[in-house]
């Protein structure tokens, strides 16, 4: 009963209010935070980075996601500066395909290789974030927003990787999940062509 009342009350909130996040510093942070969460391609890639890091274990748990966030910041700076980067949408779609495949096949790459792979893809994701920054958003807080959202998506991937790995069918779960992510990446790629 109580859940039903809360749900009914929430439906009365005008959705248009969520389309306007404000102006200035707060606007920048909220817009930046929302950007990675607004695209399935970003969500799939970033959560899958966390799962990949979990599969590798050890220092990869923080080095792999950390290299993604750092490289994404570099890509965003390029995008904010108006530096053209070819094939951004293709690179983002490829990241979903490749990362899904890496998880599905449980690729046991050296940490430095894993960091390089995710960093390469992160440049494309970052460029998309940076080049799509709202004109009235503050750059620093916008970047802080999408970097925090990305780190949280990585953390969700780490938690999901842990949860899948603890099941008796963990290996099959990684294969199925990674395969579905790769298939979604193919659909995203087909949509960008």
Which residues fall in each region the model found?
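Membrane metalloprotein/metal-transporter helix-bundle signature
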Residues: 2-193
């Amino acid at each position: 009963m109580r859940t039903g009342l809360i749900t009914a009350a929430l439906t009365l909130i005008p959705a248009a209010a969520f389309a306007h996040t404000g102006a200035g510093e707060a606007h920048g942070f909220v817009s930046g935070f929302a950007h990675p969460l607004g695209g399935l391609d970003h969500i799939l890639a970033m959560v899958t980075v966390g799962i990949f890091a979990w599969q590798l274990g050890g220092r990869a748990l923080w080095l792999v996601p950390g290299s993604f966030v750092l490289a994404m910041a570099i890509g965003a700076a390029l995008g904010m500066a108006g530096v053209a980067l070819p094939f951004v949408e293709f690179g983002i779609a490829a990241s979903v395909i490749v990362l899904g495949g890496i998880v599905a096949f449980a690729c046991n790459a050296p940490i430095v290789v894993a960091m390089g792979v995710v960093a390469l893809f992160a440049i494309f994701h970052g460029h998309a974030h940076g080049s799509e920054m709202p004109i009235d958003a503050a750059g620093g807080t916008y970047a802080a927003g999408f970097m925090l959202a990305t780190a949280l998506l990585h953390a969700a991937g780490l938690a999901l990787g842990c949860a899948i790995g603890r099941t008796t069918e963990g290996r099959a779960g990684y294969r199925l999940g990674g395969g579905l992510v790769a298939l979604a990446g193919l659909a995203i790629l087909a949509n960008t062509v």
